[in-house]
C-alpha cells in the first residue's frame, strides 16, 4: 500500500523534463491559465485550509471551477508550473523573479522607487512562461528548493495569470519590463540567455527606460497562437494606468478591481469619454458564490462591461502609483471569465474615499 501511495504521489507531481510551460489544474500543459485565490473568510472546513482555496480558469474553460487542492500545493496549476524553478537540475533554465514586496531576507531593499509590479519569467532554449500576479513575498527564491505560499498572503484575495510563450516573445516581454522597472530579487541569466535578451540583462541590473514615451503597448502571441496585449508604464508617465491610458487604448469603460485599503485611493473617474469605475464587490456565479468586498481583495484586474476585454496585472488605482511603473496583460478570451464577477462598483458621484493605514492591511500595496 505504501508503495502504491508513493507511485500515485510521484505521478501527481511529475512534470515532463524539457517541457517548460504553464501547467493546468489537470496536470497537463496549457497555453494559459488564471487563478483567483479567494479571501480567507470564503473558505470552509479546516482552519488551516482557510485562505488557500482558489478558482481556476484556462483556455478550455467555459466557467470558473474550484481549484484542485490548495494554492500552497504543487498539485495545483501555480505550484506545478513553478516546480522546475526548485529542482536541482535548473541550471539549464533562465529565470527572473521580481516583486516590489519580495520574500524576506537579510538583504533589505527600498522598493518605493521601483515599479509596483510582481511576476516570474521562466524559460529555456525553446520558450517558457510569464506569470503575472498580485502576491506579496512570492514566490520563494530558487535556492529555497521548495515551492511554498507565504502565510501573509492567505487572508486576502489574489490573482495570478500564467501564459506560455515561444522564446522569441521574451524579447518584447523583457523590453516591457524596462518600463515597469521591477525589483528583481532572484535571477539566473547566463551565457546565451544574456546575449539573446539584452533588455532582460538591463532589467536584472536595475536599469530602466531613459526617455519618453513613458508607456509601451505590445501584442504578444502565446505558444498556441492566442493574442495578448501588454500595457506597461514607467513612473514618469505620471498618471493612472486605467483612467490615464488603458480605457482610451481599449476604447471602452472599465470596471477595475484593486487593493482599496491604502491611502490616496483614486475615486471612479467619469471625466473622459471612457469612464473608469472602482469595483466594490466581487461575486462568483452560482448560489455558493462566493462573494466578497474589495477591501478583502488584493487582486488587480479590470474588465470592459460590454466586452470584449479583460486584463490581469499588478497595479492599483492610487495617487502614489501614478508615479510608479507597472502594467497589465489584456486578452479578449478572458472577458467571459471576469465579466460575471463584478457585483457592485462605485458611481462617479462619490468624490473621495480614505482608508487608514492600519496594520497589517495598510502595509500591503
UniProtKB/Swiss-Prot annotation:
Swiss-Prot/TrEMBL GO biological process terms: apoptotic DNA fragmentation
Enzyme Commission number, as recorded: 3.1.22.1
Purpose: Hydrolyzes DNA under acidic conditions with a preference for double-stranded DNA. Plays a major role in the clearance of nucleic acids generated through apoptosis, hence preventing autoinflammation. Necessary for proper fetal development and for definitive erythropoiesis in fetal liver and bone marrow, where it degrades nuclear DNA expelled from erythroid precursor cells.
Main localization (coarse): other
Enzyme class: hydrolase
Glycosylation sites: 215, 269, 293
Source organism: Bos taurus
High-level lineage: Eukaryota, Metazoa, Chordata, Craniata, Vertebrata
GO function term, MF aspect, one: deoxyribonuclease II activity
One matching Pfam family: DNase_II
GO cellular component: lysosome
Protein's name in the database: Deoxyribonuclease-2-alpha
Signal peptide region: 1-19
Reactions the enzyme catalyzes: Endonucleolytic cleavage to nucleoside 3'-phosphates and 3'-phosphooligonucleotide end-products
Record keyword Signal present: yes
Residue numbers annotated as active site: 298
Family according to the record: Belongs to the DNase II family.
Keyword line: Apoptosis, Developmental protein, Disulfide bond, Endonuclease, Glycoprotein, Hydrolase, Lysosome, Nuclease, Signal
Database matches in InterPro entries: DNase_II (IPR004947)
Keyword Manganese in annotation: no
Intracellular or extracellular location(s): Lysosome
